[in-house]
Structure formats: C-alpha cells, structure tokens
C-alpha cells in the first residue's frame, strides 16, 4: 500500500486586525510590533496581509503575529488545520474568556486556495485453490457388486470353441483353456450387468 499526500500550496489567509494604538513610538515601516510594551499594528491591513503571505509558516514567529502579549498571541501552524474552504474560521473565538483589557480585536481567516491531493494505491492479489471430492451416489454403490473369484480349475468340462477361436487346433489342448472360458464367461456377465444398469 502506498500513500502519497501532495500539498500544492501553503494555506493562504487574509487578516483583518484592528487594535488601539497604545504608544506613540510605533514602527510604520515594518508592519510589526517593536517590543512587548508596544502594542501597535500598522492600520494598513492589506500591507500586513501581503507581508504575512510572503513568509512560510515555519518562519512566522510571535513577532510576526502582530501581538507579542500572551493574551492575543496565536500560532498559525497549530490553527491552520482548523480551516474551512468555504468559510474562514475565526481564530479569536475565545475573546470572552480573556480578561477585559483594552487591546481591541484581531481576526484571522484562513482558507485553502488549492486542495490537498491524496493518492492511495492498494495492490493485493488473492489466489484460492480448492480440491473438491465428488461424492459417490447411491446408484454407484449399488452397481458395484462383488463377484466371486473364478478358480483356475473349473468343474464344468463343456467348453466348445468356435472356428474363430480355434487356431488350426493348437488351442484345443491348451492348459489355459479353462481359465480362458471362465474369464470369457465373467466378462459376459459384467457386460450383461452393465446393460441392465443402463
């Protein structure tokens, strides 16, 4: 069995992040926060989205997530599996469980542009060989009769040979004459029995 999974593209996401500006010293060039005490995101959400799309998921760290405080930080790799192709999944679903701090709201929607291609091939071969025995029917058992053995010396002396059986008188005094006639009589009986059974 061979299983191959082809992920043709990384998950793309569009983020709409709105936060209150808490410091006047903010970096507007890089689009990410300067330090833990500074909670600022550039108001240009489209530029931030392009910046996030240009990086691979392995290279994205806490500084790229637009929030360095533990209350609003999130991991893209751990939440990227919770996506729906038709509708994005809001990753800020636990806002109500957070303490009420004036940090604003952040929402990131994930969606796959291209699906995951899965190829699974299962190759198997089954060979079955059976030996069937043919059960003997009752008719076969009835037709098989045990005939008595014919002795070499028979009591009957009346054996007549035809002209076709005689070979210029050489067989008249043959010592196997009685065995021959006994065998011929037995073969006639077997032939008659076969004709009756049919």
Curated annotation (Swiss-Prot):
Major localization listed first in the record, in broad terms: host cell
Protein name stated in the entry: Non-structural protein 5
Family as reported in the entry's similarity comment: Belongs to the rotavirus NSP5 family.
Required cofactor(s): Mg(2+)
Modifications made to the protein after synthesis: O-glycosylated.
Biased composition (Acidic residues): 153-166
Residue ranges, annotated region (Disordered): 127-167
Entry GO terms, CC: host cell cytoplasm
Organism from which the protein derives: Rotavirus A (isolate RVA/Cow/United States/VMRI/1988/G6P[5])
Domain of life: Viruses
């Amino acid at each position: 069995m061979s299983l191959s999974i082809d992920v043709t593209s990384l998950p793309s996401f569009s983020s709409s992040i709105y936060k209150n500006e808490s410091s006047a010293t903010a970096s507007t060039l890089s689009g990410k926060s300067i330090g833990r005490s500074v909670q600022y995101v550039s108001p240009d959400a489209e530029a931030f989205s392009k910046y996030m799309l240009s990086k691979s998921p392995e290279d994205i760290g806490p500084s790229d997530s637009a929030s360095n405080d533990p209350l609003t930080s999130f991991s893209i790799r751990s939440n990227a599996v919770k996506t729906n192709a038709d509708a994005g999944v809001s990753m800020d679903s636990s806002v109500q469980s957070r303490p009420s701090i004036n940090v604003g709201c952040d929402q990131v929607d994930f969606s796959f542009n291209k699906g995951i291609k899965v190829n699974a091939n299962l190759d198997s071969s089954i060979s079955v060989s059976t030996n069937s025995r043919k059960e003997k029917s009752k008719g076969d058992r009835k037709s098989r009769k045990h005939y008595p053995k014919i002795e070499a010396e028979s009591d009957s002396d009346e054996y007549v040979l035809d002209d076709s059986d005689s070979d210029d008188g050489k067989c008249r005094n043959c010592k196997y004459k009685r065995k021959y006639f006994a065998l011929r009589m037995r073969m006639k009986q077997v032939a008659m029995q076969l004709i009756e059974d049919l």
